[in-house]
């Protein structure tokens, strides 16, 4: 079920629009994943794994079609005030850096598309977390285990 909700719509959309974009020699795809696809989602393996797949697909699209006029951006927010997070006090583990509203996310998307940025991060802290993860993976995993203990 998670795969059909989180991953397949990206593939279906790309299949639907890429042929015409390639024929025109230009186009823009905006995919939405989550910071969980760059980091991980404590307590939800299916969410984490499928968001990682969505990130991988967006990267692949950019690598495969970027030199053929197709631009790709990937939106990866943390906790956003939506119906999905409404029942979770403080946004749960995803809200550790605070919840943001949909308007703030939309403004980040408009700016990211204008700048043709691949990775759109409405929560700037995520960039720091990615750097920490890649700088010392084992240390990052230990930190995530400590964070997990706070929420599970």
Map each language-model feature to its residues.
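Active-site helix of classical SDR
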Residues: 14, 50
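A short helix-coil junction within the Rossmann-fold of NAD(P)-dependent oxidoreductases
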Residues: 16-25
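Residue(s) in the substrate-gating loop at a strand-loop-helix junction
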Residues: 34
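Active-site-adjacent segment of SDR/Rossmann-fold oxidoreductases
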Residues: 39, 60-70
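Active-site loop immediately N-terminal to the catalytic Tyr-X3-Lys motif
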Residues: 41-45
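Short, flexible catalytic-loop segment of classical short-chain dehydrogenase/reductase
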Residues: 77-87
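C-terminal tail/cap regions
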Residues: 91-92, 96-152
């Amino acid at each position: 079920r998670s795969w059909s909700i989180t991953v397949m719509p990206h593939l279906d959309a790309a299949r639907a629009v890429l042929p015409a974009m390639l024929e025109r020699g230009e186009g823009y795809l905006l995919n939405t994943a989550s910071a969980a696809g760059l980091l991980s989602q404590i307590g939800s393996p299916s969410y984490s794994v499928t968001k990682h797949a969505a990130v991988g697909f967006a990267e692949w699209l950019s690598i495969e079609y970027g030199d053929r006029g197709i631009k790709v951006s990937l939106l990866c927010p943390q906790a956003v005030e939506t119906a999905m997070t409404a029942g979770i006090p403080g946004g749960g583990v995803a809200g550790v850096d605070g919840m943001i509203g949909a308007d703030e996310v939309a403004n980040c998307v408009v700016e990211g598309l204008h700048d043709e940025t691949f990775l759109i991060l409405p929560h700037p802290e995520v960039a720091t977390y990615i750097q920490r993860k890649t700088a010392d993976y084992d240390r990052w995993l230990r930190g995530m285990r400590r964070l997990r203990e706070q929420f599970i």
